[in-house]
Amino acid sequence: MTNSNKVLKLGLPKGSLQDSTLDLFAHAGFHFSVQSRSYFPSIDDDELEAILIRAQEMAHYVQLGAFDVGLTGKDWIIETDADVVEVADLVYSKASMRPVRWVLAVPESSPVKTVKDLEGKHIATEVVNITKKYLAANGVNASVEFSWGATEVKPPDLADAIVEVTETGSSLRANKLRIVETILESNTKLIANRQSWEDPWKREKIESMALLLQGAINAQGKVGLKMNAPKSALEKITSIIPALRQPTVSHLANDQWVALEVIVTEKIVRKLIPELKRAGAEGIFEYDINKLID
């Protein structure tokens, strides 16, 4: 079998993570096209076959070998007790570039202050196994019921407390719920089937994918700046650039001038560019960065 007809089976998360995942892959250089109601995206890489499936099931199917590689949360790996290779941490979520939290929450009016106060109470959640382990670790005996969704509406009539995932806590506050404790922080992970990981071609393909995806995450919120400057202003200019690394300085044909290139955080650019101009920089050029590889 030649490399030209080898294929890596990729599982992509369907649902809340779908759009942010496809956007991340696009920045990494993999462009998917998803037709309405289709679970089989097309991709501009003949060595990849992708299927959309719920993140909750991903680790299970990667373990079975239905997928060589997939993306899911640390939470679902733990919840399903899946035996997979955790290739890379990809810290992004539905609406932000940060981890999510599974939290224990109760109605604002509830007397519950800690998990200990839930002895003999009823808890609703999607992560039954994680919740049971958490209760056991705290010596609490409470009943845990699987929730099919809309978990925030269940207290106080259908449950005394819930364990729910949140990025900002806004949905919980909107439903008049109060966070008692954080049970687990979770982020997206690139995971691989153990047999696939032992295949040299598949492993190299997976590692390359991980490198590009991590590079796309590293580049989020960053831009590049290029500019020319007289040597006499170089020290002043470099002193005001809060760079991720020291600027790259290149000599120009005019030996009294240099070219500078630097990567900075995008949110400071509107303040930084006028300062650079006043310090003597010319020909300032800002450009987007898709990937930043360490």
Curated annotation (Swiss-Prot):
It comes from Chlorobium luteolum (strain DSM 273 / BCRC 81028 / 2530). GO terms for cellular component: cytoplasm. Its EC number is 2.4.2.17. It catalyses: 1-(5-phospho-beta-D-ribosyl)-ATP + diphosphate = 5-phospho-alpha-D-ribose 1-diphosphate + ATP. This is ATP phosphoribosyltransferase. Gene3D superfamilies: 3.30.70.120, Periplasmic binding protein-like II. Its cofactor is Mg(2+). Pathway: Amino-acid biosynthesis; L-histidine biosynthesis; L-histidine from 5-phospho-alpha-D-ribose 1-diphosphate: step 1/9. It comes from the Bacteria. The lineage of its organism: Bacteria, Pseudomonadati, Chlorobiota, Chlorobiia, Chlorobiales.
